[in-house]
């Protein structure tokens, strides 16, 4: 038994090493004296120290390496003895007289190495004898190291193709047979280690077994290095024999390590040509074997092989690599009923990555993988294993990363079915990944059908999903997600107006049912996208769709009205107000007066009912005046109604300065230089006079409230409006009215005033002087004004 106490073990190792060193010394002295008899005597005593059962594998290895070094010296001595006339056959028989079996076999292997070198007997006969004789040691630890020594000293003496030991009687088949037999016996010893000692020490024994695995695996490495082991021999002899031993040993540690060894040490070409044999063994392994890692590594190796050697790609199709891997994974999962969901998902993730690398043009293969994954996930509900969820995201991201094109992923019918197994938070993450892929690669989604499929995938960020109790989305994250959706809208495009209208209708359906908090982010870009569509419509009489065209400006404006109506309820009345005015301008360009009037009406209703903040009212009124000034579609009646309303709003603003500025801004609604029908000088003058009256009232309020005359800035602003209309030739704006206003301002300026107003007035006077210097009508008009 191996001792528990590390201190005792150190003492035993020290004692063994001391005895070993002493006998090694006497052995070397005998070698130096060419005394074969004493050399054998002391070497046997030295090797007897390897008979101990008190050392752990780690400590035993220390002792073994000392023996290995001394045996190399002994082997050289044996070789010299044969040159001096000693018969190698007699030497081979002489070493077998050692009293204990373990030293005897070490010496026999050493003498056998010399025997093979002399070529006095076929190598295969000696190797067969040695590998059979080693059966005499059945203690797992001692037997493993003995056979490891045999493998080490024989590896350069195998009758391989091109080897000096190859001959008529010695072929690579003999070399393979020897290595396979030694491998089989070593694996049996290694597996038996698990049964040595009490059950409570099982964990320690498994750790120690892990430390010894390379002793067994080196045999497979030797096989992979033999020149004579070509594909045929590997397929017909090596692989079946190795797999038979792996399956029959029924030990999870051995099975996992050795299957992995096969994958790592033999060429990729061999794996490709023997896939069915290798994969056929996988379902026969113990259920506890980590077959997920093994198969993932196999697929990774094959993927890299295909990536580095384009000429081998036809062979993947020829051997039906994908089908074999897909079937094998299904059988493994079926055989291991308790396989964790993580392992199953990882297997399909690896298979999908393999498929995308090796068969990027076979979307049907990729879809099959996703379908198989769905089959395994069915009935399991949402995945709550964090690592499994992460692996599922990796699986779903693979097609996006490979093709850099979401459109290709949309062709995979099973893709959205896999997405359904993600939890709410992960759906949100996956949706963001998809949107970023579209933006990064500038991918255009060009049909309503594809947009529908896309939105099914990214509903994690466009719909209020059934979120777990207590799950709150960070506001910054939410805004970032919605901004990405807003950008996405501009990637949904088709030159055909009919198809584009179908696309925006799909967007409308999803956005209006996606929850109110998202609308302020998604409706504006949808409106912009729809307005772009209007600009692309053919002019009347040039419609390629004829009278029956399904997309008309009227239909689109009705559509816009429906989506903007949702905004005041969010509430986002300011946003809806702006969008109504934008739509009114678009209707103006389409010469749709009733529609434009309706949009203005909706904007006015929002102004009256929803916009109550004084600053917001000022901004809104500026937008109304600016938009109305640009409108050309309205007839006299409709325009009068709208301008009358606007001037009424201006006069009702809370603050006098705001009232004044809004009223004089309304003057522009009554004089448009390029439209003779809208040149009403009387109403222009009326607005300016009303503005002066309000400015005067504002100054009086300032005088009453603060004891000061207040700023004359408003008067100077009104003067600038007078000058503007005077320059435009409005008859009602006379020289006298301008001079009178200048005189008023000068009188006010005689009072204490603020420097900014003085500077403003001075700049205005300088402008007037500059205009006087101009030639023509402008100069003449300004020269008439006496300052």
Swiss-Prot record:
InterPro entries for the chain: Vps35, Vps35_C
Coiled-coil blocks: none
Membrane disposition: Peripheral membrane protein
GO biological process, one term: retrograde transport, endosome to Golgi
Subunit structure: Component of the retromer complex which consists of VPS29 (MAG1), VPS26 (VPS26A or VPS26B), VPS35 (VPS35A or VPS35B or VPS35C), VPS5/17 (SNX1 or SNX2A or SNX2B). Component of a retromer subcomplex consisting of VPS29 (MAG1), VPS26 (VPS26A or VPS26B), VPS35 (VPS35A or VPS35B or VPS35C). Interacts with RABG3F.
Family: Belongs to the VPS35 family.
Full protein name: Vacuolar protein sorting-associated protein 35A
Taxonomic lineage of the native organism: Eukaryota, Viridiplantae, Streptophyta, Embryophyta, Tracheophyta
This protein's encoding gene: VPS35A
């Amino acid at each position: 038994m191996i001792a528990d106490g590390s201190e005792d073990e150190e003492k035993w190792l020290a004692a063994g090493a001391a005895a070993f060193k002493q006998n090694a010394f006497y052995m070397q002295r005998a070698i130096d004296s060419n005394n074969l008899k004493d050399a054998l005597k002391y070497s046997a005593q030295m090797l007897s120290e390897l008979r101990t059962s008190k050392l752990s594998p780690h400590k035993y290895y220390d002792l073994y390496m000392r023996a290995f070094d001394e045996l190399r010296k002994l082997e050289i001595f044996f070789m010299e003895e044969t040159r001096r006339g000693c018969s190698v056959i007699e030497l081979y028989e002489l070493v077998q007289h050692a009293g204990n079996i373990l030293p005897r076999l070490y010496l026999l292997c050493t003498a056998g190495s010399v025997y093979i070198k002399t070529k006095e007997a076929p190598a295969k006969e000696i190797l067969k004898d040695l590998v059979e004789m080693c059966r005499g040691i059945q203690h797992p630890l001692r037997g493993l190291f003995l056979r490891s020594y045999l493998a080490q000293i024989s590896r350069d003496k195998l009758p391989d193709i091109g080897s000096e030991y190859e001959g008529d009687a010695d072929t690579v088949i003999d070399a393979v047979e020897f290595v396979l037999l030694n491998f089989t016996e070593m694996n049996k010893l290694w597996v038996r280690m698990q049964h040595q000692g009490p059950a409570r020490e099982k964990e320690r024994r498994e750790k120690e077994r892990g430390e010894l695995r390379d002793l067994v695996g080196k045999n497979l490495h030797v096989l992979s290095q033999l020149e004579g082991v070509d594909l045929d021999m590997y397929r017909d002899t090596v692989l079946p024999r190795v797999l038979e031993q792996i399956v029959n040993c029924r030990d999870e540690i051995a099975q996992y390590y050795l299957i992995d060894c096969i994958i790592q040490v033999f060429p990729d070409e061999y794996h490709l040509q023997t896939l069915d044999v290798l994969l056929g063994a996988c379902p026969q392994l113990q259920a506890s074997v980590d077959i997920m890692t093994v198969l993932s590594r196999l697929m990774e190796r094959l993927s890299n092989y295909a990536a580095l050697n384009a000429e081998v790609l036809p062979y993947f199709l020829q051997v039906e690599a994908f089908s074999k891997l897909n079937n094998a994974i299904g059988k493994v999962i079926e055989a291991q009923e308790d396989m964790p969901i993580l392992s199953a998902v990882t297997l399909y993730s690896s298979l999908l990555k393999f498929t995308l690398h090796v068969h990027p043009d076979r979307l049907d293969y990729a879809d099959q993988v996703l379908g198989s994954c769905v089959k395994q996930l069915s009935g399991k509900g949402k995945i709550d294993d964090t690592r499994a969820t992460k692996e599922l995201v990796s699986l779903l991201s693979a097609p996006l990363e490979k093709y850099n094109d979401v459109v290709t992923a949309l062709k995979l019918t099973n893709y959205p079915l896999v997405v359904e197994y993600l939890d709410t938070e992960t759906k949100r993450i996956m949706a963001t990944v998809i949107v970023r892929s579209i933006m990064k690669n500038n991918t255009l989604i060009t049909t309503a059908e594809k947009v529908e499929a896309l939105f099914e995938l990214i509903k994690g960020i466009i719909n209020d999903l059934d979120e777990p109790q207590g799950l709150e989305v960070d506001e910054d994250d939410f805004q970032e997600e919605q901004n990405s959706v807003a950008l996405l809208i501009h990637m949904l495009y088709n030159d055909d107006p009919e198809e584009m209208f179908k696309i925006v209708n799909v967007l409308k359906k999803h956005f209006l049912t996606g929850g109110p908090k998202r609308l302020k982010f998604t409706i504006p870009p949808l409106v912009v996208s729809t307005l772009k569509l209007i600009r692309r419509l053919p002019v009347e009489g040039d419609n390629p769709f004829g009278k029956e065209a399904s997309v008309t400006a009227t239909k689109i404006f009705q559509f816009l009205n429906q989506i903007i109506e949702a905004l005041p309820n969010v509430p986002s009345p300011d946003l809806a107000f702006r969008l109504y005015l934008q739509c009114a301008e678009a209707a103006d360009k389409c010469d749709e007066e009733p529609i434009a009037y309706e949009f203005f009406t909706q904007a006015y209703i929002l102004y009256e009912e929803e916009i109550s903040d004084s600053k917001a009212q000022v901004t809104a009124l500026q937008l109304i005046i600016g938009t109305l000034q640009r409108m050309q579609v309205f007839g006299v009646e409709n325009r009068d109604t709208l301008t009358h309303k606007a001037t009424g709003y201006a006069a009702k603003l809370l603050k006098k300065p705001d009232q004044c500025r809004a009223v004089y801004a309304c003057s522009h609604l009554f004089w448009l230089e390029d439209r003779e029908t809208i040149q009403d000088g009387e109403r222009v003058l009326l607005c300016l006079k009303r503005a002066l009256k309000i400015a005067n009232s504002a100054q009086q309020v300032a005088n009453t409230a603060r004891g000061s005359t207040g700023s004359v800035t408003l008067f100077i602003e009104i003067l600038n409006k007078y000058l503007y209309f005077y320059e435009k030739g409005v008859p009602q704006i006379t020289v006298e009215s301008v001079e009178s206003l200048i005189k008023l301002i000068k009188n006010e300026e005689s009072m204490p005033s603020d420097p900014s107003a003085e500077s403003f007035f001075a700049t205005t006077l300088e402008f007037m002087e500059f205009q006087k210097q101009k030639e023509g009508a402008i100069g003449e008009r300004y020269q008439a004004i006496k300052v």
